[in-house]
């Protein structure tokens, strides 16, 4: 399944066009490699998302063309969810 579609179906990203725009900016990795919207995702793949200061790592558990909102959480497992702290140097 295409990554942009998977992100929409799993409701990690609410709209496929938004997923495509983020993927075009190189903010996602599949198994450590930069992903494109058309990159294929398979069960067992590890997907890393960098959204602002938020970094989320998930593992794909299941692929489905459509699932109900309540069942979308079953498509992946969150491996890590962290906020990256930004440290600013003081200007004298």
Descriptions of predicted regions:
Residues 2-5, 17-21, 27-92:
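Strongly charged
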Residues 12-13:
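Loop/turn elements at beta-strand to alpha-helix junctions within RNA-recognition modules
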């Amino acid at each position: 399944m295409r990554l942009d579609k998977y992100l929409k179906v799993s409701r990690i990203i609410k709209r496929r066009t938004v997923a495509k725009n983020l993927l075009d900016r190189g903010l996602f990795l599949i198994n450590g490699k930069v992903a494109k919207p058309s990159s294929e995702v398979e069960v067992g793949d590890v997907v890393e998302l960098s959204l602002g200061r938020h970094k989320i790592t998930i593992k794909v558990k299941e692929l489905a063309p459509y699932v109900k909102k309540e069942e979308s959480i079953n498509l992946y497992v969150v491996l890590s969810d962290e906020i990256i702290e930004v440290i600013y140097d003081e200007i004298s």
